[in-house]
């Protein structure tokens, strides 16, 4: 593990600096427990309840954030989402990744990609030796690194076509990628002349390798999700197809031929969310997209099955820590 210059909290420090630059009081925020600190402060209804959104806003502006995590457990054990792509690379150890209805048992050499505004959760326990690389990136940024003959976003289309979020690397490819990530790590931390360009070169090499492996495996099958016949999978599929309508627990239970109490218990046990919570999250993610497309809040609330406009506003602010109007302002 000594090969890696640890930057476990480097991007948290960057976020703190960013928040200070826009006038947010960060005196009560510990960079080492940023997400937890934000959550606690937000629950107290302080002015920093907007921070979670602002962090997403910062990521969107920066285009790429990178860090190694060594023996650090995951904070979010329930479904959450981001406004950017997330790359999760298991260097050592193992973990469980849930992306909508899919479940992946991650091991050394596995790399997973979570698209923007996709419900997911990663579970890695701190009592086991683990090292993972986390990278948040913007698809447009990868496009900017591409050439007319080489599209660095090609692997995203391959994964989508194969209905998976996972690429598994051989031992040889794994060692090569570690070397590339270590080089990126050093360049990313450095402030020497030319290191901004070296970061771009390192990123280009990394995504060239990722694309090459994805293309080689295009015809193989590496999906290891929920049992395709599992009731939770069927429930999620039903919700994903119908969440824009006014679906109820009774409709879901009728579809699955199972009691409301039983499917509710299984769903909560498997996903960490209640069926209602999951459905609301799916609706709110679509609401963000509709807002950016110019739809009115009243039309969004009605078309997505919210009981009233005040109910929509309340749920939106609860989820994103910001009102729909503020969301549009910060998204400009």
Predicted segments with their positions:
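…primarily DNA-binding HTH/wHTH and HhH modules…
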Residues: 1-4, 303, 313-332
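A hydrophobic/aromatic-rich effector-binding and dimerization subdomain
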Residues: 2-69, 119-186, 212-217
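Conserved short histidine dyad/triad with adjacent acidic residue
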Residues: 66-82
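Short, conserved beta-strand element in jelly-roll/cupin
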Residues: 80-97
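Short acidic-glycine-tyrosine-enriched beta hairpin
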Residues: 101-116
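Short hydrophobic/aromatic patch on the recognition helix
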Residues: 109, 262-267, 311-312, 316
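Short, Lys/Arg-enriched, Trp-marked, Pro/Gly-tolerant hinge/linker segments that flank
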Residues: 163-172, 188-199, 208-237, 241, ...
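Terminal helix-turn-helix DNA-binding modules in bacterial transcription factors
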Residues: 237, 241, 246-250, 258, ...
